[in-house]
């Protein structure tokens, strides 16, 4: 399942995402992963969740972002939730590419039965 948190800059998308990450980290029977562009969520996200910085892996573009998601999932079958912050900054502002990316992630979600949440 894919969920999108959509809103304008400053609308509280990241704050809502952090709440969801921390809630999932407390209640999930598996592992929780949060992917963000830089290191802004370091002290906001629970230590029980795995925080990954896309910039550490030079991720730019939706194909690379999908590769990261698939690789993270392939490396750990115990992951139940994957959260992504600043999706447009990691990928691009090309909405056609965003739609294609979300379709691929939806297929990955259906195949692996994992939950994905992104801020847009």
List the predicted regions and their residue ranges.
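Conserved P-loop
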Residues: 1-73
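Conserved P-loop NTPase "ATPase switch" module shared by AAA+ and STAND
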Residues: 77-93
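A general secondary-structure junction signal
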Residues: 36, 86, 118-120
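Hydrophobic anchor at the start of a short beta-strand
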Residues: 30-32, 80, 116
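A structural signal for short coil/turn segments at secondary-structure junctions
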Residues: 27-28, 76-77, 109-112
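A short acidic (Asp/Glu
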Residues: 45, 93-94
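Substrate-engagement module of ASCE P-loop NTPases
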Residues: 97-120
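Residues at alpha-helix caps and immediate loop-helix transition turns in enzyme cores, especially N-
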Residues: 16, 94-97
